[in-house]
């Protein structure tokens, strides 16, 4: 150290004067050169004295300021090159280097400092400082002190030194070591050794890509925590599971579309939207396998890893993939909550006519599409989208796990709680219906309830399992991420050979990353995500789906499907009633039913229960004979009854018009009505086809029915009982007479009870046919329906 070297300043001048005198007398150029300090040491030129080394002639240096120099013992340079650049002077001193006592030791320290070559921006500014301290210019027993500006220029780019080891005391920018405004010869040296980045860092001029405290270098695009073989293994894994998920969800979507008219019913149609979300998400995962797409997605133009997206200087490929994957994932999990809620409310309404989801579907869509949109916009606003070469996509929180916890785990955890609550309540509702009301359930409905409870249980178990796996894998990442970053930083420093302050000559050990994430955990995490999509698609793995595709194939190829169809009774009767006019002309005509009339559960079997009707379906083969059944029951009449009221009618005003039809009543009712006829005028029978003949007999007049009737159709032939209008004298007992209109019968030419002079009494039927009105009255039809309600058609 300089403190151990006594310097006798006054004795130096006579000694130097004596040396100059000897030089002039002897004329030895070699010795003069040696004394001038411009050679590196003994050599052939100085030994023989026959040759001379030319010294470049330079302009005299400016006078050294008093505060810019310090007295020192000058030594001839043993190494005239500092960090690859030639020095323009021949003498130096080790006074300023506090960790070196000789030029050899100073040279060894410079070799260690040369590890900063792997930090390009730091290396560009620290080279002059190191040469000015370890190999300063020394002349006339005074050493030049480097300026404070030269020292401070290294603080920013070389922050890694301060962070890792700290600056030595003699390199701290203190005024006694680095005075202000001092020129230095080293500042004029052009250092031609450019810095480079050691793998896994790459050179970049983008400040956003710089690795922390290593300006000019960024992390390479390929994740250094995983090997190349692990990258290939993970990519094959993603390709396989992504393809399976995409195909399963695509099959589900196609099944719904093939039978959309029957499948577009809540809550089953919610599974269509859930599978659509997972299908779009799988497309985002598989996009990396297009030619050159993965590098475009996860890498920046300078070859560094993407993080902190979106940025204005890069393409939108990373952001697009993030939006596709994240938005689809969040929309899918929100739809899952809506699905469990719809199941819960639908099961509660079983056995009633109440439609709990009516009017709520718009709110379902508003919630499921807007909430993921808000989360996506929030992530893009805070610029926390990062790329990952292992997964091949861009996602939130690869760099900062706190954002991944807030934008991924928090929504999924909330979905698990809410969806699990509704799912458990739905299963409990089904179990309660089955246990407490066994008599209300048909065998088919009970079987559907058992099947649905089993499927809901399996589905709930898978959902809880996949969410638990996702949380476990993320917590594994969160708890170990700091250790992985530390291990990677040590690896970077080892590769850069930054060993500041460790004066050792031991060989540098092999650099390796000691702690790395497990590839198996990453695979399990991806399996949970892809497995959720596959589980959502299993709801259409039913026999009903096979029937749908069979009908679709027959429809596309033009072949007929000979399998008997199941048709709802209500649809069948409505079909026959709508064609009553055609069937009246041709009673043997068969009804044709389109595929849209056919009743089936849709692709999601087991979610539609009919607890009130034990046999809601009938065979399509039997349905072809529905015309005979309708005719036998009197549903097809010569009059238009298409608007017959279904509720209790309100009695109209008592006036004769086309909407009131006379009907025969029982004798008991006739007696009661006879008293009222004294207080009101007798009414004449109205016949729409011809004027009613004037009545002159004293027979009891049928009372006006209070049931509203439709206008009569034109006169048509039909069968009526002859004894309802005449006596046995005019026709045989039990014989039938063909009349034009049962409501306006044609009188017999021998005797007509409505013509003047007719004295035959009316014959009223007794028993089941007695006391009833005409054969086509509303009362007669209703009783016939009640009596034949249990008959087999």
From Swiss-Prot:
Residues 259-265, 340-362, 428-455, 550-793 are cytoplasmic. The chain crosses the membrane at residues 238-258, 266-286, 319-339, 363-383, 407-427, 456-476, 529-549. Residues 674-684 have a biased composition (Basic residues). PROSITE patterns: FZ, G_PROTEIN_RECEP_F2_4. Residues 585-597 are annotated as: Interaction with DLG5. G protein-coupled receptor which associates with the patched protein (PTCH) to transduce hedgehog protein signaling. Binding of sonic hedgehog (SHH) to its receptor patched prevents inhibition of smoothened (SMO) by patched. When active, SMO binds to and sequesters protein kinase A catalytic subunit PRKACA at the cell membrane, preventing PRKACA-mediated phosphorylation of GLI transcription factors which releases the GLI proteins from PRKACA-mediated inhibition and allows for transcriptional activation of hedgehog pathway target genes. Homodimer. Interacts (via C-terminus) with protein kinase A catalytic subunit PRKACA; interacts with free PRKACA subunits and the interaction leads to sequestration of PRKACA at the membrane, preventing PRKACA-mediated phosphorylation of GLI transcription factors. Interacts with ARRB2. Interacts with BBS5 and BBS7; the interactions are indicative for the association of SMO with the BBsome complex to facilitate ciliary localization of SMO. Interacts with KIF7, DLG5 and SDCBP. Interacts with GAS8/DRC4. This is Protein smoothened. It comes from Mus musculus. The lineage of its organism: Eukaryota, Metazoa, Chordata, Craniata, Vertebrata. The gene is Smo.
């Amino acid at each position: 150290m300089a403190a151990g070297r006594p310097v006798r300043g006054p004795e130096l001048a006579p000694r130097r004067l004596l040396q100059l005198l000897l030089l002039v007398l002897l004329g030895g150029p070699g010795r003069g050169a040696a004394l001038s300090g411009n050679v590196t040491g003994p050599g052939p030129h100085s030994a023989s004295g026959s040759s001379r080394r030319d010294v470049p002639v330079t302009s005299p240096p400016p006078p050294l300021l008093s505060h810019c120099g310090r007295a020192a013992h000058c030594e001839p340079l043993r190494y005239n090159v500092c960090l690859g650049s030639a020095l323009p002077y021949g003498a130096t001193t080790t006074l300023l280097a506090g960790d070196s006592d000789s030029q050899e030791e100073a040279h060894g320290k410079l070799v260690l400092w040369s590890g900063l070559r792997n930090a390009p921006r730091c290396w560009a500014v620290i080279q002059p400082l190191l040469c000015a301290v370890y190999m300063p210019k020394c002349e006339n027993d005074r050493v030049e002190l480097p300026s404070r500006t030269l020292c401070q220029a290294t603080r920013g780019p070389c922050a890694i030194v301060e962070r890792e080891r700290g600056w030595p005391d003699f390199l701290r920018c203190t005024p006694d070591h680095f005075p202000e405004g001092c020129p230095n010869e080293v500042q004029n040296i052009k250092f031609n050794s450019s810095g480079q980045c050691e793998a896994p860092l790459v050179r970049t001029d983008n400040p956003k890509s710089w690795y922390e405290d290593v300006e000019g270098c960024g992390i390479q695009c390929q994740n250094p925590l995983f090997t190349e073989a692990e990258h290939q293994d993970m990519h094959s894994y993603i390709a396989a599971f992504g393809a399976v998920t995409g195909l399963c969800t695509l099959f589900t979507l196609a099944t719904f579309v093939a039978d959309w008219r029957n499948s577009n019913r809540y809550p089953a149609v919610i599974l269509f939207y859930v599978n659509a979300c997972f299908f779009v998400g799988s497309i985002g995962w598989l996009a990396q396998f297009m030619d050159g797409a993965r590098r475009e997605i996860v890498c920046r133009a300078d070859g560094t890893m993407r993080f902190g997206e979106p940025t204005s200087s890069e393409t939108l490929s990373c952001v697009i993939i993030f939006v596709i994957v994240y938005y689809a994932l969040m929309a899918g999990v929100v739809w899952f909550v809506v699905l469990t809620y719809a199941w819960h409310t639908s099961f509660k309404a079983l056995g009633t006519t109440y439609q709990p989801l009516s009017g709520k579907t718009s709110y379902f869509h508003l919630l499921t599409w807007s909430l993921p949109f808000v989360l996506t916009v929030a992530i893009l606003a805070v610029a926390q989208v990062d790329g990952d070469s292992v997964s091949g996509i861009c996602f939130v929180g690869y760099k900062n796990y706190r954002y991944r916890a807030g934008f991924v785990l928090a929504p999924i955890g909330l979905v698990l709680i809410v969806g699990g609550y509704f799912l458990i309540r739905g299963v409990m509702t089904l179990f309660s219906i089955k246990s407490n009301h066994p008599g209300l359930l048909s065998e088919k409905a009970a079987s559907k309830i058992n099947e649905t409870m089993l499927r809901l249980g399996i589905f709930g178990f898978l959902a809880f399992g996949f969410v638990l796996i996702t949380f476990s894998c993320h917590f594994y990442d969160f708890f170990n991420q700091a250790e992985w970053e530390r291990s990677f930083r040590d690896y970077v420093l080892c590769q850069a050979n930054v060993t500041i302050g460790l004066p050792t000559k031991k060989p540098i050990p092999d650099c390796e990353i000691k702690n790395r994430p497990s590839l198996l955990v990453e695979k399990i995490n991806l399996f949970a995500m892809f497995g959720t999509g596959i589980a959502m698609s299993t709801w259409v793995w039913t026999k009903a789906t096979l029937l749908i595709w069979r009908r679709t194939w027959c429809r596309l190829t033009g072949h007929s499907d000979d399998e008997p169809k199941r048709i709802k009774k209500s649809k069948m009767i409505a079909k026959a009633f709508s064609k009553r006019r055609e069937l009246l002309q041709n009673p043997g005509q068969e009804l044709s039913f389109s595929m849209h009339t056919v009743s089936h559960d849709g692709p999601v079997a087991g979610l539609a229960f009919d607890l009130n009707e034990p046999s809601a379906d009938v065979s399509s083969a039997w349905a072809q004979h529905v015309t005979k059944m309708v005719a036998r029951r009197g549903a097809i009449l010569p009059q238009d009854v298409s608007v017959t009221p279904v509720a209790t009618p309100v009695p109209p005003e008592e006036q004769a018009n086309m909407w009131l039809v006379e009907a025969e009543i029982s004798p008991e009712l006739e007696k009661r009505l006879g008293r009222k006829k004294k207080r009101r005028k007798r009414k004449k029978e109205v016949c729409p086809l011809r004027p009613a003949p004037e009545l002159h007999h004293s027979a009891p007049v049928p009372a006006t029915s209070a049931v509203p009737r439709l206008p009569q159709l034109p006169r048509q032939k039909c069968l009526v009982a002859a004894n309802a209008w005449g006596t046995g004298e005019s026709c045989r007992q039990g014989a039938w007479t063909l009349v034009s209109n049962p409501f306006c019968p044609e009188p017999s030419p021998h005797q007509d009870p409505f013509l003047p002079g007719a004295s035959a009494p009316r014959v009223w039927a007794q028993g089941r046919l007695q006391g009833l009105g005409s054969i086509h009255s509303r009362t007669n039809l209703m009783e016939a329906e009640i009596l034949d309600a249990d008959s087999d058609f």
